[in-house]
């Protein structure tokens, strides 16, 4: 996204900064800098902005013919559903956010331009959402599959996309199959998009009713702001993932061979099968605190002013590069029976490992546990692929 609330003034601020840094679209040495901009849902799908026609015409970027007029005024170029630009001999293709009424014809466009794009030399495709079924996709996607189908014919295609805010500590951020797909991370905050489905401890949901069900406060995703620095070669990419909050690498560089192929180093299924889960040290201890009132610093709305059991989980060690702890699977056992299971993100999951040595938390309401209190907690540390170490 360029804007946050879909307002023209937000794009104006962005354009002013661009002009300040690159006056006349040129670097300090006079070299031309190309604008490789694509819009996201916060630019073109800002349905939360309400008002009459006069107000929306003045304020909202997506209203009627505003995209074309505003884009031309701010960036001195046409607002095209799909554009193609050349930078130092490499082709870049960008596609705008689909609105449902004027969607970019991605599949048709790639069929028409197939001959000029085919080959071993990489070209780059930019859109807001991850292509369906690729990097950071998890069990949800905001792409309907059209970009995946369009790019599948090009082993030299490299898609760079976002929308998910997925942290770049996630080792599945690079996906290779019929093409290459890369999670761009998020400048504002690296989080975990899958958290909406399986975690209590990440993003606060925008749904006020669902927010009341959160047992734990969200982990600070602003601390996880990140970006990529990519060195481009004809047969490979060197990808550096960078923490903006700490101004240091988020992990080891990724060296990606091109063209893509199934079964390569970034085949996510093979990465998972060969990865090793993190391990607790032999001296690690789980601290269990019985609270008459849930701790305010940790508890979410569902446990405010209620009794709970607070688990304080020590950080496990990384056994193999690329397999740092990402989350914890906690089971409540009574005798040999599992009563319930919860998954929480590791505190520090989205920051450089050098500053991630932190205690993680998990809360259970007392009403979730046996009345006698006779139960056992089993904690398994997992990496970003869901591979667990020993309990």
Predicted regions mapped to residue ranges:
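Active-site glycine-centered loops adjacent to acidic/histidine catalytic or metal-binding residues
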Residues: 1, 40-41, 128, 162-163
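Metal-dependent phosphoesterase/phosphodiesterase active-site architecture
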Residues: 63-76, 83, 171-391
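Short acidic, glycine-rich surface-loop motifs adjacent to enzyme active sites
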Residues: 117-136
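Functionally important transmembrane alpha-helices
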Residues: 150-163
């Amino acid at each position: 996204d360029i804007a946050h609330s879909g307002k023209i003034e937000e794009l104006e601020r962005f354009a002013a900064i661009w002009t300040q840094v690159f006056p006349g679209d040129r670097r300090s040495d006079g070299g031309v800098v190309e604008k490789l901009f694509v819009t996201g849902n916060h630019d073109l799908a800002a349905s939360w902005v309400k008002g009459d026609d006069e107000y929306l015409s003045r304020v909202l970027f997506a209203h009627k013919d505003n995209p074309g007029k505003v884009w031309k005024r701010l960036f001195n170029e046409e607002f095209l559903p799909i554009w193609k630009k050349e930078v130092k001999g490499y082709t870049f293709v960008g596609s705008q956010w689909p609105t449902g009424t004027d969607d970019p014809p991605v599949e048709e466009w790639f069929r028409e331009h197939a001959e000029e794009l085919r080959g071993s030399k990489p070209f780059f495709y930019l859109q807001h959402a991850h292509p369906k079924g690729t990097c950071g996709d998890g069990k949800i996607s905001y792409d309907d599959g059209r970009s995946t189908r369009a790019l599948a014919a090009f082993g030299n295609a490299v898609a760079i996309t976002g929308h998910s805010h997925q942290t770049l500590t996630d080792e599945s951020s690079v996906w290779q199959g019929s093409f290459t797909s890369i999670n761009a991370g998020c400048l504002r905050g690296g989080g975990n998009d899958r958290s909406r489905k399986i975690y209590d401890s990440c993003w606060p949901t925008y749904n006020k009713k669902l927010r009341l069900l959160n047992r734990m406060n969200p982990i600070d995703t602003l601390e996880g702001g990140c970006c990529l620095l990519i060195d481009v070669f004809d047969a490979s990419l060197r990808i550096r993932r960078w923490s903006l909050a700490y101004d240091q690498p988020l992990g080891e560089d990724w060296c990606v061979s091109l063209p893509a192929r199934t079964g390569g180093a970034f085949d996510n299924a093979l990465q998972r099968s060969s990865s090793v889960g993190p391990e607790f040290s032999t001296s690690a201890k789980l601290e269990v605190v019985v609270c008459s009132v849930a701790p305010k610093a940790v508890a979410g709305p569902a446990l405010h002013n209620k009794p709970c059991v607070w688990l304080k989980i020590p950080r496990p060690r990384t056994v193999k590069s690329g397999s740092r702890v990402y989350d914890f699977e906690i089971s409540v056992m009574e005798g040999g029976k599992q009563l319930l299971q919860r998954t929480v993100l590791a505190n520090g999951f989205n920051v450089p490992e050098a500053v991630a040595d932190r205690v993680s938390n998990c809360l259970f309401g007392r009403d979730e546990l046996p009345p006698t209190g006779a139960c056992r907690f089993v904690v398994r540390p997992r990496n970003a692929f869901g591979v667990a170490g020993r309990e």
